[in-house]
Amino acid sequence: MGITKRSKDKAARAERSAGGDKSSSAKPKKATFDTTKKKEIGVSDLTLLSKVSNEAINENLKKRFEGREIYTYIGHVLVSVNPFRDLGIYTDQVLESYKGKNRLEMPPHVFAIAESAYYNMKAYSENQCVIISGESGAGKTEAAKRIMQYIANVSGGGSGDIQQIKDMVLATNPLLESFGNAKTLRNNNSSRFGKYLQIHFNAQGEPIGADITNYLLEKSRVVGQIANERNFHIFYQFTKGASQQYREMYGIQKPETYLYTSKAKCFDVDGIDDLAEYQDTLNAMKIIGLSQQEQDNIFRMLSAILWAGNLVFKEGDDGYAAVSDQSVVDFLAYLLEVDPAQLVHALTIRILTPRPGEVIESPANVPQATATRDALAMAIYYNLFDWIVERINLSLKARQATTNSIGILDIYGFEIFEKNSFEQLCINYVNEKLQQIFIQLTLKAEQDEYAREQIKWTPIKYFDNKIVCDLIESTRPPGIFSAMKDATKTAHADPAASDRTFMQSINGMSNPHLTPRQGAFIVKHYAGDVTYSVDGITDKNKDLLLKGVQNLFQASQNQFVHTLFPQQVDLDNRRQPPSAGDRIRTSANALVDTLMKCQPSYIRTIKPNENKSPTEYNEPNVLHQVKYLGLQENVRIRRAGFAYRQSFEKFVDRFFLLSPATSYAGEYTWTGSYEAATKQILKDTSIPQEEWQLGVTKAFIKSPETLFALEHMRDRYWHNMATRIQRMWRAYLAYRAEAAIRIQRIWRKKRVGAEYLQLREEGHKVLGGRKERRRMSILGSRRFLGDYLGINATTGPGAQIRNAIGIGSNEKAVFSCRGELLEHKFGRSSKPSPRILVVTNSKFYIVAQVLNQGHVQIMAEKAFPLASIKFIGASTARDDWFSLGVGSQQEPDPLLNCVLKTEMFTQMKRVMPGSFNLKIGDAIEYAKKPGKMQLVKVLKDAPTSQDFYKSSTVHTQPGEPPNSVSRPQPKAKPVPPRPITKGKLIKPGGPGGRPARNANPNRTAQPRPGGGPSIAASNPLASSAAAASSRPVPAHPGAAATPAAAKSLPSHTRQQSSTSTVRPPPPPPPAPAAKPKIMAKVLYDFAGTRENELSIKAGDMIEIVQKENNGWWLAKTPEGQAWVPAAYVEEQAPAPPVVAPRPPPPPPPAANGGGRVAPQPPAKRPVAGRKPAPAPAVASLQNRDSGMSLNGANGSGSDASRSSTPTPSIAGSLADALKARKQAMAKRDDDEDDW
């Protein structure tokens, strides 16, 4: 039914107006094929996975990582895999392509997340936040910087103040990275703190200010690092790049001088230039607005921290701590502007207040004094970092009214180590709070959309982790943080006693997500169970900055020290200061309050490997990250309702091609509303009703398979058009190719390859079962081709080698390949060097290629007459090393390495005059020096499959047994007959251009009309094949009245009149005698190890069903039918066949057109690479050699065309028909010879 357009019909216009169409210009444009479309790797959105599992997610991420696609969506969540290389995807051109684009219009990218957040902030006046999580080295900081880069680029604002704010926001990155990042084992630029950057915008979407909140600074890194890690970057930048003024004022020396920077013995990092980054840090300070005085104060405190680390204590005469070097104390006191005696007193005397108004001073031992020194250094750096963040916020403070904001959270991901302590508890607690935000915001938004669109759906079930958050942060009943603080109060002087008290509190808690253990406890987080060790956990929670140290800071004459430590010390106040857990709980709740007021976007970062390799993808490690990031849960939550949703307009624009009612030749022809067009498309594509729903403004699709089907149909639309154009051309090319291939195939079977196989078998005899073999050496496809480099060729690289080394015209190369020669150098280890090995009918050449003045020069390094080679030495292992025992008095014997050694030995044996001596032993014998024999040991201890030589020893791996022979020759994969085309007509495939017949070798004669039952009558497959190749035969006299007989005549044959006299057809020839069974006697026992191998015992008689040239015969016993090795059995002479009496000859007038039964083609060979599967039934053998016809109902094949000779007259029609049949059958016999 055609589509009627009534563009001037008022009713139609009214209908379109009611349907929501704004104007005629809003309809989709004419569809055109996208020639720049890039083939998608995997799926770009994990919600479209057919099977949702951690393994399926991991496999999809791997495909995209290997295809240089590092970004993948989970709905609105972005998953990012660190590429460890520059992919060129952050250029200004790429950034411009994402401006103003919808998330679905462009491939997944961090710019798309930034664009979505900025667009939603402006369009809906909603505060936005981007939450970035993942393990160290996964790319969190890089993602945060790219979001800031995009927002700074697209947010406009040409005024100087706006540009200044943008510059300061971008300058915070190098500054905070210097003070908050460090080199770890897993990441050279690891963020050791969390931050939340909030950019404020005015009503026009221009940035007018920002503020930063920092979390969880790893201050313990200041005083200690594990091996091959570093302190914070700023210490190495400062000690390497400090000006001469700073070196004189603050005594700055190289990082090797200070304990805090040299403890881990790591001073430089690949890819990090400390001097250049120090200048970037100073420049960032200037952009943010730090004065020179403020910069001096910062570096003064850094110097104090470095010198504090060099303050070493020793045990005094009284048994307590004493200072080892007073000069360090004096210089540290100078930097802090305190009295040296007061400094020593603060570090070596502990102030206790057991009762109000009572102060007790207790001397400290060496470990206690060292801990106090480290606490002083950590306190200075921790407060200095907080001051820098506050100073940045002061410079970035908005100077006009703020409308909305975009927040970027870059924080630790879940941490699960072998030993987890207080730090991991705090990090995982913050992640639990972030997961709580995800549950409340994301799932709630999902439910609101379904309700707004009036969609019928099943409520999403999810785990509410509020119970876990309460377990950690609750005060009534006490949670983990509160119990930790109470334990510190109870036994504040003894950390071990505090830990025991805390463990008692844990044992008394009743919570399904808490499990006490011996000296530990398990918390069931949403990302998995984590076991936390109690040892030392309370000591990390309490404030280690003693009141004596606080008194020291208050006594300082430096105003900046007072700024860092503003609180006054009240000696009478016994109330504990806020613990680390208290501060984490307060800041986490403040962060949650801020994020709950925002619309979130999520970025999950993944680290593909631990080696920072751009090509390695460590599947187990990534799978672990997929699990603890909860990607599978994210996908299931997204798919719990509908996997795909889109507005009516965009859905129609994408899929209108799929319905003939909405499109014609790529043009959009629908005149109704978009909602009606959407419904029509889904109806015409036969999408089940339960797979989709239409809301108020959007179409919802349930499963990703449905969306895949729609996308597939859309892609096939263009392919089908191209297929129509290509079909006839391909048919002609197929005819030419098939004709050439069939000619070549028959020629190769008869002529090519026999001599190479015979030479390969001779190679086994040369080794004589004395040397282990490599698996590749005994493959069935291995051929001994000899001249691999083409030395005998007249042109090409081989001819160049021949001319360069002077091989005479009377010499013929029998073998050539590349190998190695062991070179002995004075004072140095022997080293294999590449060489070219050439064996001619008279000499053995060792050819070297050297670089001479920029040109490659080929020369014959050594040339040995074959007659001079007394022996060839090799080992019994599978290695490729061998020696040539020349026995020269002037030069040593060469020790060579050649992967084709067996073939080389075989060729040499064929052409060497005299005897061929191959010495195979446990070691390789050769003359390392003239007249001095040496043995090269061979050890089977190589860590890899690659052999290597070291210190007169060849290291290899165990090989195949020495008595191994070549595997059976793999068979070519059976290819179904292809259609042979001639002009515009397509003929069936198979030999001779006709359908191939059944491959059953035991089949009886072809059925004859009027004959008895046959195989074709009982086998549907054989029956159909026989019907396709049957010839018309005249009916018996009197059979015309039978409807079946009448139907058997072809339509072009005249009907016989009742008065005509036609001789009856001759009787059919007797069925050929049954083929005698081939029996064989078992010579040796054989135990089958595979399903298609038959176990046999010596002395048994078995029937041979089929023989193959690959050394395997198909045998049959009462136990079953399978393959046995031909070498294990001996064929027995068959019994003489019983000759059936021949029938009397037919009457002379009648021509015997029955012909003989055409011989059957041999069964096809099994699939290449393995033995053929057993063929227990006749039907399976028939299927193996079945033909393929492409004619269908257009005809019965070429045989039918040959049997359709019209009858010239009624008289003699029988004789002519039989004669034509005989000729056709004779031609068929000729065709059989091709097989």
From Swiss-Prot:
This is Myosin-1. Residues 773-962 form the TH1 domain. It comes from Neurospora crassa (strain ATCC 24698 / 74-OR23-1A / CBS 708.71 / DSM 1257 / FGSC 987). Residues 1075-1134 form the SH3 domain. Residues 1063-1073, 1135-1150 have a biased composition (Pro residues). CDD domains: MYSc_Myo1, SH3_Myosin-I_fungi. The gene is myo-1. Keywords: Actin-binding, ATP-binding, Cytoplasm, Cytoskeleton, Hydrolase, Motor protein, Myosin, Nucleotide-binding, Repeat, SH3 domain. The keyword Repeat applies. PROSITE patterns: MYOSIN_MOTOR (PS51456), SH3 (PS50002), TH1 (PS51757). GO terms for molecular function: actin filament binding; Arp2/3 complex binding; ATP binding; hydrolase activity; microfilament motor activity.
